[in-house]
Swiss-Prot record:
It is an enzyme of class 2 (transferase). One of its GO terms (molecular function) is 3-deoxy-8-phosphooctulonate synthase activity. It catalyses: D-arabinose 5-phosphate + phosphoenolpyruvate + H2O = 3-deoxy-alpha-D-manno-2-octulosonate-8-phosphate + phosphate. Pathway: Carbohydrate biosynthesis; 3-deoxy-D-manno-octulosonate biosynthesis; 3-deoxy-D-manno-octulosonate from D-ribulose 5-phosphate: step 2/3; Bacterial outer membrane biogenesis; lipopolysaccharide biosynthesis. It comes from Bdellovibrio bacteriovorus (strain ATCC 15356 / DSM 50701 / NCIMB 9529 / HD100). It comes from the Bacteria. This is 2-dehydro-3-deoxyphosphooctonate aldolase. One of its GO terms (cellular component) is cytoplasm. The keyword Transferase applies.
Length: 288
């Protein structure tokens, strides 16, 4: 007989992140372009999520360290970025998530933000995992595009061995040949199992990247962000990870995948309705 899986709850302040709880929205800018833009985007998300009663965490990067071209905009850097994050937290009372790329960044970043993120390309770097684990912060682990869902258990185990079990797993698509990504929704349950019920979320905007094989920046398919997000929530997820911009065509990074800020409210109305419906169903075991 197959016993039901226990869903682990990870707390971000008073926000509970779990696969059987109402979905949490991790959303904001791909990269900090300016203090004023960050304030504008964060304020809009706070207003909409308060109205719809959706738990919310602001996301952005202070340094996009893995841009395709050395000439691409990377961000304001850690020092200025942390000042902006601190101001957002003070002004709007919002929780914040951002990524770290180097060992020395883990501690100072964790002292300001509420969740630190392990980037997909760095997810198997043991020294970085150890440094992040030691902060005691909640960790969001991006699943590498090249890694199977089952292999995520090894990364979770690394964090546990280093004393941190406050782990969220984030799917951002899987390589499908060259320069294309697909989302394997069957993999969500595998990640839940190998992580012993850790929360699993979907990065629906990054998963829509579609590269020009000879280009210096990613293309994208933002016209499909709603359908991909619905597909993820239909499986039963702890949250969505969404990037947005007031003018995606002018965004300094990943604009082709970004949800227009003007579409945030109708988008979230749909997502909340679907999530509420899916999580109202009793668990159905079809294995026996």
């Amino acid at each position: 007989m197959v016993l039901p899986m226990q869903n682990k709850i990870v707390k971000i302040g008073n926000i509970e992140v779990a696969n059987d709880k109402p979905f949490v929205l991790f959303a904001g800018l791909n990269v900090l372009e300016s203090r004023d833009l960050a304030m504008q985007v964060c304020e809009h998300f706070v207003k909409v999520t308060d109205k719809l009663k959706i738990p919310y965490v602001f996301k952005s990067s202070f340094d996009k360290a893995n841009r395709s071209s050395i000439h691409s905009y990377r961000g304001p850097g850690m020092e200025e970025g942390l000042k902006i994050f601190a101001e957002l937290k003070k002004t709007f009372g919002v929780k914040v998530i951002t990524d770290v790329h180097e060992i020395h960044q883990a501690k100072p970043v964790a002292e300001v933000v509420d969740v630190i993120q392990l980037p997909a390309f760095l997810a198997r770097q043991t020294d970085l995992v150890e440094a992040m684990a030691r902060t005691g912060a909640v960790i969001n682990v991006k699943k590498p595009q090249f890694l199977s869902p089952g292999q995520m258990g090894n990364i979770v185990d690394k964090f546990a061995e280093c004393g941190n079990d406050k782990i969220i797993l984030c799917d951002r698509g899987t390589n499908f040949g060259y320069d294309n990504l697909v989302v394997d929704t069957l993999g969500f349950n595998i990640m839940k199992k190998v992580s012993k019920g850790s929360p699993v979320i979907l990065d629906a905007t990054h998963a829509l990247q579609c590269r020009d094989p000879f280009g210096a920046a990613s293309g994208g398919r933002r016209g499909q962000v709603a359908e991909l997000s619905r597909a993820g929530l239909a499986v039963g997820l702890a949250g969505l990870f969404i990037e947005s911009h007031p003018n995606p065509d002018k965004a300094l990074c990943d604009g082709p995948s970004a949800l227009p800020l003007s579409k945030v409210e109708p988008f979230l109305q749909q997502m909340k309705a679907l999530d509420d419906l899916v999580k109202s169903f009793p668990e159905l075991n079809t294995e026996n």
